[in-house]
């Protein structure tokens, strides 16, 4: 049982943090969620929004209980996001803020790799929900922090990229290539 009425008691910054994860679910699996949260009166649909997000997580976790394949898509925005949290000593950015920034950065990385350009869509919806979209730290520092990410596999990091909207894919990116991509302007 989920009581969505509790959401009305949250301070706006905490509510917005949660919206970063909602945005993630919309981009990785169900674009209808993005449509719902784009409406000015989206809070009237919170039961449906939460239901859709829980369904996605349930389906993904049931399909990959050991987090060795499909379940990795739940980490969209988290690779760079966790790096940013680490660089900020886990005090300067909230988790939701870091994930929002990470989703935008992952979309920029996807463009550099020739994938679908969702940068503007992700940036716009994050900003509409009071979330930051730009890294407050040098990308070199984020890259160094990402070297310790759980998605690292030997000489690559499994990055979650979205293309097209509603479909997340796991992209193993060699560390050397990743360094070049994320530090190049």
Predicted features along the sequence, with ranges:
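Active-site segments that bind and position negatively charged phosphate/pyrophosphate groups
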Residues: 32-140
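Anionic group-transfer/hydrolysis microenvironments
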Residues: 5, 77, 166
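A glycine/threonine-rich phosphate-anchoring loop and its flanking beta-alpha core
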Residues: 1-38
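Residues that scaffold the ATP/ADP-binding catalytic core of kinase and kinase-like folds
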Residues: 9-10, 83, 168
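C-terminal charged capping/lid subdomain of soluble metabolic enzymes
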Residues: 14, 20, 116-185
């Amino acid at each position: 049982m989920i009581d969505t009425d509790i959401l009305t008691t949250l301070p706006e910054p905490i509510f917005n943090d949660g919206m970063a994860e909602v945005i993630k679910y919309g981009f990785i699996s169900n674009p209808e969620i993005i449509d719902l949260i784009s409406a000015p009166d989206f809070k009237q649909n919170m039961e449906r929004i939460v239901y859709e997000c829980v369904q996605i997580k349930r389906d993904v976790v049931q399909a990959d209980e050991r987090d060795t394949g499909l379940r990795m898509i739940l980490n969209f925005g988290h690779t760079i996001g966790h790096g940013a949290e680490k660089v900020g000593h886990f005090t300067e950015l909230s988790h939701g803020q870091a994930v929002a920034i990470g989703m935008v950065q992952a979309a920029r990385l996807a463009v550099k790799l020739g994938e679908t350009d969702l940068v503007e869509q992700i940036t716009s919806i994050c900003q509409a929900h009071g979330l930051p979209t730009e890294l407050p730290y040098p990308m070199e520092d984020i890259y160094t922090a990402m070297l310790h990410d759980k998605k690292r596999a030997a000489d690559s990091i499994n990055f979650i990229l979205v293309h097209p909207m509603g479909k997340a894919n796991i992209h193993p990116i060699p560390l050397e290539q990743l360094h070049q991509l994320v530090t190049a302007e």
